[in-house]
């Protein structure tokens, strides 16, 4: 009877691409300066793992009875906390890293100032190339409304809800019940990137988030050793980004 074993290897956190374009383990030496990530690595990793989140929550103390919260976040397994620390360092130390549960940690940037000063300028200069770029565009529109205090008025809140309707999972059932006349804004179209627009460091960052290296071992009568070894590199994505 034939048998098969599979081994899946995710890229370890100590093999990330730093600014000098080399993979390095040297940062583990506490006497050395912390390396800085290449900007395109950060964008590639964000295309794979980041989320642009808008939360609309009940808040009776506000004139609109609602509050708007913003968040840029990246969640990873706790063994990869180092990557989040390097990303936080890249963004000038803004945001927090905290446990989500026993096995995962999350990097969050929530303040408008930090989003305006660090997060948005980065993705304006080094844009996302997956369909997540549409989420960023919508997120940025909401941030701009909040910069002008429009989230504090009912009219402004309704504008935000129309945008959020096309962001991530859209509007919650609670929001739809309270704002039944909101019509979601059309989701921005993101052009397919040209090959020469995909930089090596973006590929490195994206692969660090989504890439897997598989080793498959199965019994084989054609091999002198009685087994056959196959190697596979794989990147998995949602249908919209294939």
PLM-predicted stretches and their roles:
Residues 1-242:
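Sequence-level preference for short, compositionally simple segments enriched
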């Amino acid at each position: 009877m034939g048998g098969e074993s599979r081994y899946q290897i995710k890229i370890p956190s100590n093999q990330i691409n730093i600014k000098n374009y080399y993979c390095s383990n040297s940062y583990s030496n506490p006497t050395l300066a912390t390396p800085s990530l290449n900007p395109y690595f950060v964008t590639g990793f964000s295309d794979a793992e980041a989320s642009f989140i808008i939360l609309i929550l009940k808040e009776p103390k506000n004139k609109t009875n609602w509050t708007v919260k913003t968040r840029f976040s990246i969640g990873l397994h706790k063994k990869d906390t180092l990557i989040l620390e390097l990303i936080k360092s890249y963004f000038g130390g803004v945001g927090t890293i905290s446990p989500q549960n026993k096995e995962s940690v999350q990097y969050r940037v929530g303040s408008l100032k930090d989003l305006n000063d660090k997060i948005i300028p980065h993705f304006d200069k080094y844009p996302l190339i997956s369909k997540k770029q549409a989420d960023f565009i919508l997120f940025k529109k909401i941030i701009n409304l909040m910069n002008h205090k429009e989230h504090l008025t009912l009219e402004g809140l309704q504008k935000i809800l129309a945008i959020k309707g096309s962001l991530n999972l859209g509007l919650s059932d609670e929001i739809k019940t309270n704002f039944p006349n909101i019509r979601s804004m059309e989701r921005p179209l993101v052009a397919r990137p040209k090959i020469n627009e995909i930089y090596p460091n973006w590929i490195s960052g994206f692969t660090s988030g989504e890439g897997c290296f598989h080793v498959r071992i199965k019994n084989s009568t054609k091999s002198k050793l009685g087994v056959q070894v196959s190697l596979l590199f794989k990147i998995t994505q949602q249908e919209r980004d294939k």
